Curated annotation (Swiss-Prot):
Its cofactor is Mg(2+). This is Hydroxyethylthiazole kinase. The lineage of its organism: Bacteria, Pseudomonadati, Pseudomonadota, Betaproteobacteria, Burkholderiales. Transmembrane segments: none annotated. Pfam families: HK. The gene is thiM.
Length: 260
């Protein structure tokens, strides 16, 4: 297993590519996370659009540089909307991220919709340990949208899920792990207050999509997104409280210089 961080050359190259290209990234996410997700994308130089207005799911799912679907978008959009966007991406080769929020938390109808989306072959699946263990067929009930399991305990499950789905799978925790079912990358660091900022994990899915839009290796893109998140959180760590930390975190994302 290899460890990477902000000082890894490939991580900085991934961010530099996004800043040069300013990719159009389309997302279906929940209204709780939409604002932070958009601001994270803007901070790294991407161009976001979020929501299911009219024919956006079909048109933008097919035409964006990349797509991310946070399944808590079901709060305000129907399952058919998520399927439409995922199908459009799958049929046109648009790379996309699946974030199966709260999977395994005790809502079987919701979980069934999440499982259906796997048929549209996401490029990356990201979530917390409880969500990914459940998606892989294990048992690790989350506490609502929060995890009750460690990222270490999810390692075997995410490897199996990656091999079965063909997706890169990324689990967040004190140490993040990203795997394609063969190779696994570990990313340490960050700040525990990210877990106290609404939508921070959801916005990570958006950042992964921005890096995926550059058409490089999905494993490298997903791992780089975690490393970028970690360094921004570390640099925001001297913020006084959770609210100022959230603002400072976006500031630090916007100030990251791949050439530093």
């Amino acid at each position: 297993m290899e460890s990477i961080n902000w000082n890894t050359r490939s991580v900085r190259e991934e961010l530099a590519a996004v800043k040069r290209a300013a990719p159009f990234v389309y997302g279906l996410t929940n209204y709780v996370a939409a604002n932070l997700s958009a601001n994270v994308l803007l901070a790294v130089g991407a161009a976001p659009a979020i929501g299911a207005a009219a024919d956006w799911p079909a048109r933008f799912g097919a035409g964006a540089g990349a797509l991310w679907i946070n399944t808590a978008a079901l709060m305000s959009s129907g399952a058919d909307t998520l399927r439409t966007a995922a199908r459009a991406a799958s049929e046109t080769g648009t790379r996309w991220v699946l974030d199966p929020v709260a999977t395994g938390a005790g809502a079987p109808e919701y979980d069934a919709i999440v499982q259906e989306l796997l048929a549209f072959r996401p490029s990356v699946i990201r979530g917390n340990a409880s969500e990914l263990i459940a998606l892989a067929g294990g048992t690790a009930a989350g506490k609502g949208v929060d995890t009750t399991a460690s990222s270490d305990s999810a390692l075997a499950y995410i490897g199996d899920l990656a091999r079965r789905s063909g997706a890169v799978v990324a689990v967040s925790g004190p140490i993040d792990y990203v795997t394609d079912g063969i190779d696994t990358l570990a990313i340490a660091g960050g700040d525990a207050r990210l877990t106290r900022v609404t939508g921070a994990g959801c916005a990570l899915g958006a950042l992964i999509a921005a890096l995926l839009a550059q058409r490089g290796a999905a494993l490298a893109a997903a791992a780089a997104a975690h490393a970028i998140y970690a360094i921004a959180a570390e640099r925001a760590a001297d913020a006084r409280g959770t609210g100022s930390f959230a603002v400072r975190f976006v500031d630090e994302l916007s100030l990251l210089d791949p050439g530093e």
